[in-house]
Amino acid sequence: MCIEIENYKQHDLFNYFDYNQIDNDAEDLLNTLLNISEYNLKLNKRRVPVMEIAKVLGFNIYTTKFNDYNVKATIGISNQLINKYKSNKVIILSSEYTDEEILFSLCYELAHYIYDSNPSNEYSHTYRINDIELRAIRFADALLMPITSFKEAYTELSSNINNQELLIHALSNTFNAPQVVVQRRIKQVINTYENH
């Protein structure tokens, strides 16, 4: 049990859609987890230890080939999972995607755990489409590419790389994130930041 996440989940998150606040909270939660020595979490340069964070949160992680190629991941929280998975918290990721896509999907499922699961109810979702998805996507972006680190990396790399495509590729390698997610993060953080 990760008390830091459980404490955070005590906030009323039902209508929590302020994207700047989500960026800051994701970074604060990450820094809190990184600073707890018993978790032994470390950044690999700028890469966030997403798998290790999920394990600290009590999840068992599995990969499989889903029948539906469009399913990238699913999350389940239920005591009924214990017999099969040896845990009541499971995230299953598609093995048919790149490592970067798998890490993003894991961040996305962690966002649903933080914002949408209720400890008193079982929780399981695979397909979701609505504003809650946008919130989960934003949190996943912010966890995989924390705002401060992303701004620093963007500034550092863009001073040496003038080609936008090469810059996106370099940022993708820096954060181990899908290029499409890097493009979205640039729009969220850099374009917004430069317009103020």
Residue ranges and their predicted role:
Residues M1-H196:
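Active-site hotspot residues in diverse enzymes, especially metal/ion-binding acidic/histidine motifs
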